[in-house]
Amino acid sequence: AFTPDADFPLIYGEKGIVRALASKMVDLSPIVAMSGGSVSNAVCDSFVVTLPKDKKLEASLKDRKDVDLSSAGEIDILTFKGKAAHGSTPEKGVNAALLAFSFLGSFYQIPFLKKLSDLLSDPTGKSFHGDSYDETFHNATWNYGVINYESNKRVFTATIDYRFGSSADPKKAIAAFEEATSTNVNILSEDKVLLADKKGPLVSTLMKSYRRTTHRIFDKPFAIGGGTYAKEAPNCVAYGSAFKGHPGDIHSPNEYIYLEDLYKQIAIY
């Protein structure tokens, strides 16, 4: 079976994905509140922290270009600016929450924030022994997309998007995260690794049709860190229908397809 849920030529491997929520009861005084991120599968690119007005803090931020400072009465509002990236490639982004943890943890000597900054800055999870590597999927990745804290409840939460290859033990990796960060982790969902035989009849037959139609005989099937509908059925792979580099505004209001591409897809399928 195949699903037209990705790019040609064919995806034979998809990382496993664990989506989880880490939480901890903790006092992060003098911080009043922290929040950032909108979805778990994207790098948090903006993180807002509110604190009591502090002239020394304000002075220390004068030369920083990655923080915007504003005030409202007796409250300072800090907006840390990172760089967005997909949750499968957190190394391509800059997590704004981790920028905040690094700065505030050192400035106010907050042990929990200093610990998170030290442990979570490496997106492979190596700092807390949550890493793994194999030739097909390369490094595991850890992304923390939505982070919140409220001083009145003293509850810190962070979403986890953990993606791993065939060599990983996800239970051990999550346990390592819990132990290192002193948090409680609640697993929300888990997708297993998908790995089809590149030389098997399914992949070989589909690649033969693709190459015969497009004449792109050197294109090869590939593996990804994301997930497709192929995981929802046995013996299934993602096979098209998009052609790499061709515009189409996927998932946008003006999503479209060139007729030339449509006719080529019909011929392949």
Describe these PLM feature segments:
Residues 2-167:
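Midchain, well-structured core segments that form catalytic/ion-binding scaffolds
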